[in-house]
Amino acid sequence: MPTSTVKRTDLIFKKDIDYSAVMHKIMKMGKDEFIEELIDSGLRGRGGAGFPTGLKWKLVKAEQSPDKYIICNADEGEPGTFKDREILDNAAEKVIWGMTLAAYITGAKEGFIYIRAEYKYMQTKLRIAIDRMEQNIKALGIKFKLDLMFGAGAYICGEETALIHSMEGHRGEPTNKPPFPVTHGYLNKPTVVNNVETFVNAIIIAEMGA
């Protein structure tokens, strides 16, 4: 496996972030205010559908459910595609803290990185980064448990409803919408499903502004 196949990089790989400081900033700013900033930034889902990220988080936040979930779709199945692999391999903490930010904003307490089976070699690195995040958020008073879940190689599981069915132990098949995952997602609970790159951009926006 080459150490890097990326010839040109941007803030995703270059920028260092003080994640605790960013979370303090957002906690001081307020959840609704940050959602509006995320909407103003124009960030859309980077997985292909292009749904406004701020609106998705706003919809999940508005749901009156004690159980909500954050899912990172890292089931990168397009032939020749390795964007998510590079981000997870070289900027995993940005992904994890982007998910933590989403959890804080929406009120979710649990999340999963759904990762393609071929990327299992990353799990040790990812679990170390997850453990570090979970230790750091204790001082912030944030409760968020994050785990890894591996796919079985089905291309269709890159689609969010098929991915959720797979996570629940069912055959990974997509379903008609509505209902949407923001209201009836994982375990039929409100769920944010965003792509790897989307979560990274969210934490960068949290630090730099819209």
Regions found by a protein language model. Give the residues of each.
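Histidine-anchored nucleotide/phosphate-binding helix
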Residues: 91-105
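Iron-sulfur (Fe-S) cluster-binding modules
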Residues: 1-41, 108-113
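Conserved phosphate/anionic-ligand binding catalytic regions in large, soluble enzymes, centered on
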Residues: 40-59, 153-165, 169-170
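Gly-rich Lys/Arg/Thr-decorated short loops/hinges at beta-loop-alpha junctions or inter-strand turns
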Residues: 14-19, 72-84, 181-186
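Terminal amphipathic helices with adjacent charged low-complexity linkers/tails
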Residues: 1, 110-123, 128, 146
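Short coil/turn connectors at secondary-structure junctions
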Residues: 7-8, 32, 40, 64-68, ...
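Structural signature of FAD isoalloxazine-binding scaffolds in flavoprotein oxidoreductases
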Residues: 60-72, 194
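Hydrophobic alpha-helical positions that pack around
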Residues: 123-210
